[in-house]
């Protein structure tokens, strides 16, 4: 009876904790992520007295969590393929019962850790590249669904806290049709997903001024609540639920101590914390669990400093006159950060990247500990994006070593910038490692009931041995998990630690490197994470008192182990662990050597998270602006140009609109805003400067069967159609280019090299923005031409692609696979942009447009019609013809693949010869007189204006960036100055002392073109002469054929060079693989040798033990033999006695027989004996007759 009651109690308690904590074990073994549908939220005002279900019910019971098959779910150009088979999900493991012993799971943990280590050691071949998040949005039927963002007016993308769904690493996409939740496998994967989707919705985020809102909030504790109840809070921002705390039992106070952080928030008005009491399901009368709320105006906690206060709880039914009501202590900070376009931070980022050491030395004495932490965080994030973080940490650490001198014990014991920087870097790149190494161990410890208190003043003497055994067991397990985690140790940290070891050796102090590594990793990362798992995102819940004490003791032992120190008289009650410490020192030394050995750098991917570089630069600027103002003038003068740079950025911040780059205003505000109209700034410029007649729709060569569709639109670089909202993707077998070089930020395309494009209007939109689709703009503008009475500005028209070209996958690129060309902002291969900006032209125009990742889509008929219309001299007629069929035009891909007048090479699939475009056409005949200011549209289409000199259009083509750059999008087809193009360069633009913006450059170029046009109007030949020139062009077909063959030869030569380069790269890759496999083989041999040595040591120990056992057995045998001999003597004496007794017995039997015979004879004779004979036994065993005595 009692056993059954106990079992029911155990089951009830387990389910109680399961319902309370709602932390189902994460399925990290999942081969995919899954999508979920969020139910509609319920605002706190709409809720009745009863609270909604606790976290976890959503993911366990709601039937609407999986996407409906009837709902279309499509991402444009994104996950557009089906996977070949369904991917099964591993089952969720049940939570460990709280009253189960932690000791029971120790063998499982040990075997799992050993198996993981052995498995990792056995992997001599490189791992397969695991599937990225672009393959992880799967429905249960394994069909890929899509979410169409192209037609949405407003899309909200935000992370979902784990307390809402009971699942970590989720995010939500909210559109007009509803919201979808998606689950990822890690925080880094979730951040990359969210950023890619945000860039799909707002492609020009880095090129525009934006504002970001950040909230950090601690729900600490509550007081004046009824005892013996459990309480929890819900956090709502503007009446939208964002997170929940765990339920905590009331003792003195209800202590939660939980931290929440939210980024990319909309502007907030109020922060509301709702207080609930957990209801007991057994008591049906307890229905009203809602206790009240605390409302914080966002303005009251705005600023850089945290605000911590006790806030009264406003209850629904206040009871006056009965003392103070409940109160909650909350600590919060709400920040609004203004972020300028990336171009505005370029000089600032370059200065920080190159002069961080002097800056830190100047600011170290005046900064507070909190400011040092914030500044170190911003510096680490920025330098991680620029690839300089290893040098930064190494330089700071060596300066710290020089400062401390012989006082090695002071290193990492003070709040310096170096200490804070390594802390932030460990948190940045080591979060996943921390989860893999200690996550399961900490969770199991939370769920166990082992008591590890070993202080005699806090526990009884009878329980002390058991508690000491518990603590030793937990420490063994924790250290086992740590030393076996070397196989998943982050590659970046290994590189940093290896650099420290190398620098210490070069300074003649190799002994201090081990202290640096152990102190940084254990003192500043692992041990604090063990003591406070909630602060390191291992768990949300703050531990209870017993668990907190256990974690503190484990951290003490681990830290002493890392310091190679024993417990002394200060903590004498821990001295029983000294034997464990001494035993594990060797393993600790091996672990520290392993994680700092440059020869064992693994093939694993580097940091995969996303860094918002604009936000970090804005934060660092505000910190430096405040700090530099406090410095003395003598110190400020040593900072070089930094004060001026800070002033420039501050001026841009304080001037609304000054940070907006030309041509980027509201490009992504609505899907069609940039497509339906041209830039207001350009319209104003056209009106004021009377330039509308100068924008020319030019037909380059005479129409032939091969080149009759070659047109281009000259358009201002300040105008850019709004890109269609689409989502970026990458193939599963494509290298992860976005995170090359240690995970550069997507917005660092223009900040990683000092020789970036001079005078460009903005930084590139990023590596993941898909090609712009401008058909809608073309259709609307072409349709509007006939209705205009004045000449039409065609700047908003989309550029026209050659016939037979259409977007395709990046894998079809003619250049290096997977390495898209770097595009300047607003260029889209527009020749006008290239000429106006004075930029070196990319050689991408020399080959097929497939080098940009495009194949073809025919716009043949449109181009043919436009050519015919231009030939007839009536451009407006062609416009009217196209206006009648805008749908057909909109369906065709329109883009320009030839860069700015660079020699156009015919397509390889051309059916016949073509005249080269770079050959100057014959001089045109003089046009009829026309007003200077305006040119009619029909005149624009009939006149054959001479093109600018080849020095402007077809200048030499150096690389976009320098050889030392680490840009992810650097083109492999650009190899310096092209020898074929140099002879054609007539002149080059000289360097301008002032770098105008793109709009001014375009205006200047148009004015220049106007002057050339007017000069040619007065000097051109007459129309009959033009006809004769055309007949000469028709007779020069042989020259055209020769030009075509020369172009093909040049293309073949270029391809040959590319193939040679590719072959060299492949050869280098093969050599690297051979060296890597050789290193792995040597590592395997070394590992086998170490294993053999360990086995030899074990065998020697076993043999010595057997010999000692044999000696003990011999001694025992001798003792037993002596005992046997003594027993044998006793047995012999007993045998003799038994023999004598047998003889006496035989005589007795014979005497009895005689007596019997004697009595029987007397009875037959009738004589009765008067005196019966008495027999007596003598001493020697014989019988004696008593009558004879």
Curated annotation (Swiss-Prot):
Pfam family, one: C2
PH domain: residues covered: 101-202
Sites marked Breakpoint for translocation to form KMT2A/MLL1-DAB2IP: 172-173
PTM per Swiss-Prot/TrEMBL: In response to TNF-alpha-induction, phosphorylated at Ser-728; phosphorylation leads to a conformational change, and thus, increases its association with 14-3-3 proteins, MAP3K5, RIPK1 and TRAF2 in endothelial cells; also stimulates regulatory p85 subunit sequestring and PI3K-p85 complex activity inhibition.
UniProt-listed InterPro entries: C2_dom, C2_domain_sf, DAB2P_C, PH-like_dom_sf, PH_domain, Ras_GTPase, RasGAP_CS, RasGAP_dom
Tissue: Expressed in endothelial and vascular smooth muscle cells (VSMCs). Expressed in prostate epithelial but poorly in prostate cancer cells. Poorly expressed in medulloblastoma cells compared to cerebellar precursor proliferating progenitor cells (at protein level). Low expression in prostate. Down-regulated in prostate cancer.
Start-end of Polar residues biased regions: 653-668, 715-731, 938-955, 966-976
Lipid bilayer topology: Peripheral membrane protein
Example GO molecular function: vascular endothelial growth factor receptor 2 binding
Modified residues (Phosphoserine): 728, 747, 978, 995
Biased composition regions of type Low complexity, renumbered to the chain: 669-678, 852-865
Basic residues bias (residue ranges): 20-38
Main location as per UniProt: cytoplasm
Compositional bias of kind Basic and acidic residues: 39-49, 1023-1035
Region called Disordered, residue ranges: 1-75, 653-678, 715-742, 803-823, 843-865, 895-998, 1015-1035, 1164-1189
Subunit architecture: On plasma membrane, exists in an inactive form complexed with TNFR1; in response to TNF-alpha, dissociates from TNFR1 complex, translocates to cytoplasm and forms part of an intracellular signaling complex comprising TRADD, RIPK1, TRAF2 and MAP3K5. Interacts with DAB1. Interacts (via NPXY motif) with DAB2 (via PID domain). Interacts (via PH domain) with ERN1. Part of a cytoplasmic complex made of HIPK1, DAB2IP and MAP3K5 in response to TNF-alpha; this complex formation promotes MAP3K5-JNK activation and subsequent apoptosis.
Primary role: Functions as a scaffold protein implicated in the regulation of a large spectrum of both general and specialized signaling pathways. Involved in several processes such as innate immune response, inflammation and cell growth inhibition, apoptosis, cell survival, angiogenesis, cell migration and maturation. Also plays a role in cell cycle checkpoint control; reduces G1 phase cyclin levels resulting in G0/G1 cell cycle arrest. Mediates signal transduction by receptor-mediated inflammatory signals, such as the tumor necrosis factor (TNF), interferon (IFN) or lipopolysaccharide (LPS).
Domain notes: The C2 and Ras-GAP domains constitutively bind to MAP3K5 and facilitate the release of 14-3-3 proteins from MAP3K5. The PH and Ras-GAP domains, but not the NPXY motif, are crucial for its cell membrane localization and neuronal migration function. The PH domain is necessary but not sufficient to activate the JNK signaling pathway through ERN1. Exists in a closed inactive form by an intramolecular interaction between the N- and the C-terminal domains. The proline-rich motif is critical both for PI3K-AKT activity inhibition and MAP3K5 activation.
Name under which the protein is recorded: Disabled homolog 2-interacting protein
Organism: Homo sapiens
Gene (UniProt): DAB2IP
